Each structure stands twice: as structure tokens, then as C-alpha cells.
């Protein structure tokens, strides 16, 4: 087992990474202070790992209940969030009840948001079961739900007590979900660590094959980088925005097609292709680096052409973005691997990128 720490003073927490961690009682015990636990999971993950988690919690002598949500990005909304609150209230959960998010990014984001809101804040633990959630969404305290007009526009910054990332859970991931997670690994290397990007290029096939050593290193290094960024800028006042490379275009794709049509990581992968193209057009990135970026995204079996939503629709969707200010779209662009720029771009350049990178 590897442990990475997120250094946030009195709100610091560990990220435990390894195989078989869902069943290890001692990893949960220090973070559960009250007399009850509510597991929040979904219809896909509960049959796979719910019993193992409940068995791990049983020796603690807590009252354990489970809320099972429908599976998918399409359900990341108020109605599904209320199912969590319904379960908590029905079970008489109190301020010391610990929520445990067992699932991917949707489950983690909604459980964290529910924890932030219920009785104005109860503790929660992240147990991410997808590669995307292990390398990205479970770390850093971003929680929330989608709105029909924009992704993740309603939420809160609320840190977990711990992240327990069981890489053994990745063996049951569908191939599309695995590729979606590799997209966030590629993003992390591209924005923050040229050496890690080199490693991803050399090992993308090992990741595709789910080789445990490659997956463990990808999760570890991605978490180290994200933990460092979050410690420096917890609430996305500046530096943390670089983690949104590929997300401005990507979120527009998700909202434009309807949540769940493309997986989040698929949209981010394509969004990085689009952001790379725009980076070259603005004279920030060299063509050879853009080609390397596109090649590793394609090698991860991610889409490299965006849907033809139309220029006006893309622009409208990108203006509904957390980085936008007074309606001005901000992009995270590459200068070189490991070096980014947060900037606006002329509409003509964005239109040229859309013409080149959409169907």
C-alpha cells in the first residue's frame, strides 16, 4: 500500500492506494467517530463491492445503512441527491454519521455534496472504484451536481476524511470507463510533469491492459500532483484552474450532447485535443508536442473529434463555465508539457479550432 497525504493543515487527509483495500477495516476505523455509517453507492457497484465494504465496517460495531443510487452522469442532479437525504433522514442520521462514497466520480461528487449540506456538514470518506475517480475526482474536495445549463455548477468545496483507492476494483471496469480515467492521467502529466507525460507515452498500452504496477504508478503520481496543487490553491483561486485543461471544451461537449452520452473522461480527452490545437494556433505550443498529445490520447482509445454542435452552441456552452468571468471564456492552454497558461482567446481562433477538431 502507498499513502499520499493532502496537506491542508487541520483538514489534511490520507490517500491510500493499493489492492484489496476495500476490505481493510483498519483503514476506515480512524475516520469513523460516530455510531452510524451510511454507504452511498449505485446499482452497478453495490453488487460488486458493497458486501466487502459492509464486512469491513462490521467489526467497528456501527449501525450501517446503504443508499443505492441509479448509475450514470444523467442522474447527477437534485432528484438523485434527494435520495441520499431521504436515506439519511429515514435512518435518523446525526451530525456524527459518516458517509462513505463507494463508486465513481458521480457517486463521490454527490456524496460529498450531501455530506457538506446535511446538518450543515457531516464527515465522509471516498472509496473510488473507477480510474477517473481514483486519479482525480475523489481528491481535492470538489463536490456537486450538474445543471442542465452547465456541468458541476452547483456544489461546494468539502474535503473527505480519507480516500481509499483500491486498484483491485479497476479489474471490473468497462473498457470505456478505463479509457476515461486514462484521460485524466494524461491531463495530469501534460499540465504538471513532463517526465510523467513521457512515462504515460511509454506505458499507455500497459494501462490499457490494466497491468497492476502501471495502474498503481499512474494513480500514485496523479494523486501526488493533484494533492500538491490542492494544498497550494484549495478553492481554485488561480493555480488549481490548470487541472481544468481540456475541460472547457469537454464540459461543453457533455452539456451539449446531454449528460451521459459521452463519459466525462472521453469529453476531457477530446477537449485536450481541441485545447492543444488552440494552443498551437495562438503560438504557445509547438506542433510536434501537439502531435504527441493527440497520439497518446488516440492510443488510450479516446475520441479525438468533437461532435458538430455548431460554433454558436459551443460558445454559449463554454460561457457557462466556472472559469468564465463576465461572460469571457477562459481556456487552460499548453506552452509545453508541464507548463500551462490560463487565457482568453480570440473568437476567430476558437472557431478555427472547432472547424479542425469537430466532425
UniProtKB/Swiss-Prot annotation:
Gene3D superfamilies: 3.40.50.1970, Dehydroquinate synthase-like - alpha domain. Transmembrane segments: none annotated. InterPro entries: Dehydroquinate_synthase, DHQ_synth_AroB, DHQ_synth_fam, DHQS/DOIS_N, DHQS_C. It is found in: Cytoplasm. GO terms for cellular component: cytoplasm. Its EC number is 4.2.3.4. The keyword Iron-sulfur does not apply. Keywords: Amino-acid biosynthesis, Aromatic amino acid biosynthesis, Cobalt, Cytoplasm, Lyase, Metal-binding, NAD, Nucleotide-binding, Zinc. This is 3-dehydroquinate synthase. It comes from Burkholderia cenocepacia (strain HI2424). The gene is aroB.
